């Protein structure tokens, strides 16, 4: 009987039901299929990368712009996760992506975003990854970013801070950014956040 069960037994039962539910959703080959929800930075960074590479696709730009606009909150910001607080870096990237999508800076939703960005420290207060996107877009100086020497990959596994002690996602990110940062490329996008 449930009313006679101890808290530990109730927790154990809940855990087993959750496990069984997940195993029931697993495909025979061992994988799960489901929706992956993310924030607007993936779409914003995709548009920034496409602009950097010169890969203009009006349909993709329009779709990304619609998605980013649909996730903007009433105060002009975007969050990092559903229901989360406003995030400065996410808002800066979304704003720039919408400018690339053709949104005018004096449009009410853009003015709200820009004013919020300014009130919360501006681009100077964004995370390093956002400032790297800004540098690639000619909106931030590479001189004002941390330097990660690509030679870092040569450090042996026994050395402190060697890349083999990092998670695979961190290793891929840091090595790629170290290489890009050593070249310091910039392709001005002809817009600003001001």
Q: Where would I find each of the regions flagged by the language model?
A:
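Preference for long, amphipathic alpha-helical scaffolds in soluble/luminal domains
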Residues: 1-194
């Amino acid at each position: 009987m449930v009313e006679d069960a101890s808290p530990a037994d109730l927790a154990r039962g809940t855990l087993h039901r959750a496990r069984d539910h997940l195993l029931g959703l697993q495909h025979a080959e061992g994988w799960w299929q489901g929706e992956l929800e993310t924030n607007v930075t993936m779409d914003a960074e995709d548009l920034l990368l496409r602009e950097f590479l010169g890969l203009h696709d009006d349909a993709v730009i329009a779709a990304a712009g619609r998605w980013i606009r649909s996730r903007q909150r009433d105060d002009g910001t975007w969050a990092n996760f559903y229901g989360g607080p406003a995030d400065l870096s996410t808002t800066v990237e979304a704003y720039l992506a919408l400018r690339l999508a053709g949104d005018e800076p004096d449009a009410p939703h853009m003015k709200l975003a820009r004013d919020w960005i300014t009130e919360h420290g501006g681009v100077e207060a964004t995370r390093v990854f956002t400032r790297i996107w800004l540098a690639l877009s000619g909106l931030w100086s590479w001189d004002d970013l941390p330097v990660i020497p690509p030679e870092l990959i040569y450090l042996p596994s026994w050395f402190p801070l060697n890349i083999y002690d990092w998670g695979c996602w961190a290793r891929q990110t840091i090595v790629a950014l170290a290489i890009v940062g050593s070249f310091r490329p910039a392709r001005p996008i002809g817009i600003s956040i001001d």
